[in-house]
């Protein structure tokens, strides 16, 4: 079915796209199909995808093994409630998750999206302390962080970036430490942890957990910080009052930074781990929140007798089957060479741009490449130019960045980096 001019007019008038004004909507480009690393426009042009559909489609599009997993599961059942029922797809997926994550993380809660995974992690932390008889209700997090758009997740996002002022009185008043300043490739400076440690000491009796994005702060600014900061956070949290550490790896999990999980850069094991995005290879919405048996049993032995959360589509068999197939692909370990090759090429083709005074900073880690401008970019104008060049890149704020599928070829990646370089000029 082709998209007509009438369809686009309907879309513009009636369909509310993410972060888009209904009175002044940004242009939308109709995609009719996708395969490998290319998106097929309705007018026949193809675009090399540099976004992995917001960082999720790590294996590319229309992957035969993921298609097969979805098709086979669809013939059995697309959905069944998860309350009082289980099924092979969920069991196999959770077994893989337990095997590939740190040994301490033994209990898996499946949910609908990354935002919900964060909601689940925050509820776990609050219920954990209630079960222990302590009234700890605040979360300590970092400036420039992003954890999702639902109310609980928003409450631990950067107050300025997430416009907390719009929802004053509704969002919980949490604690925000100064974001780490020491970059990944710089020499570690111990004073970088001081604002975090001071804030935690000041509010030690109130804090239930610390939540952060390990090493890479994603939608809050694509900031790549020193792994030692994460290690020192873990040390401060453990030594001080044994608070729970929540790692939001929704954007970084499953190889994006060059490690399977970004926490591995600092050899840190969190108490709660949030996963999403690439979990299904970008096919369907699904997330997972993993925690230790200690946390799970403490919650279960509390007054409620259980963890108080249960989405309608929890453990959806179709999503679980595709996620299981996606993780099976990762387990074959081709991603390591793929991400390493992407990182090498991004450094070769993007880092020289950092010599220009117009760009405060160009940074690369794993399959992430970021060019930061001095002023906010014109998203609509840049997007139009990118499409004309046959690439799909979605800038935001001051940033033009790439997070391509792992299967991208060198020539395709060069088309993306060349487009970024030209746009930045």
Curated annotation (Swiss-Prot):
Ribosomal protein among keywords: no
Keywords: Aminotransferase, Biotin biosynthesis, Cytoplasm, Pyridoxal phosphate, S-adenosyl-L-methionine, Transferase
Principal subcellular localisation of the protein: cytoplasm
Listed GO biological process terms: biotin biosynthetic process
Pfam family, any one: Aminotran_3
Substrates-to-products reaction catalysed: (8S)-8-amino-7-oxononanoate + S-adenosyl-L-methionine = S-adenosyl-4-methylsulfanyl-2-oxobutanoate + (7R,8S)-7,8-diammoniononanoate
A GO molecular-function descriptor: pyridoxal phosphate binding
Annotated site residues (Participates in the substrate recognition with KAPA and in a stacking interaction with the adenine ring of SAM) in this chain: 19
GO CC list: cytoplasm
Cofactor field: pyridoxal 5'-phosphate
Protein residues bound to pyridoxal 5'-phosphate: 114-115, 248, 311-312
UniProt signal peptide: none
EC number of this enzyme: 2.6.1.62
Task of the protein: Catalyzes the transfer of the alpha-amino group from S-adenosyl-L-methionine (SAM) to 7-keto-8-aminopelargonic acid (KAPA) to form 7,8-diaminopelargonic acid (DAPA). It is the only aminotransferase known to utilize SAM as an amino donor.
Protein name: Adenosylmethionine-8-amino-7-oxononanoate aminotransferase
Organism: Serratia marcescens
